[in-house]
Amino acid sequence: MAETSSTTAGAQTLLRGLAVLNAVYNGCHDLKSIGEFTGTTRSTTHRLVTVLVEQRYLRHVPTQGYQLGAKL
C-alpha cells in the first residue's frame, strides 16, 4: 500500500511531537531551547507545544517552563 502525502505529513507531525517530548525530557523547558533541540521554527514549536499541553502530555509552569504532563 503506497503512502499518500497526507499520511506522510501526519507521520512527520507525529515525529515532531515526539521530538518535542524528547526535548523536554532532556531538559529543554522554554520554546527557544525546545525549537533548537528539535530543529523547528518558533511558530511550529509553539503550535506543537500548545497541542501537547492541551492534551496533557506537557504542562506549563510559569516559573519553570514546560514539563512532562500527567499523561506521561
Regions found by a protein language model. Name each.
Residues 2-72:
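N-terminal helix-turn-helix
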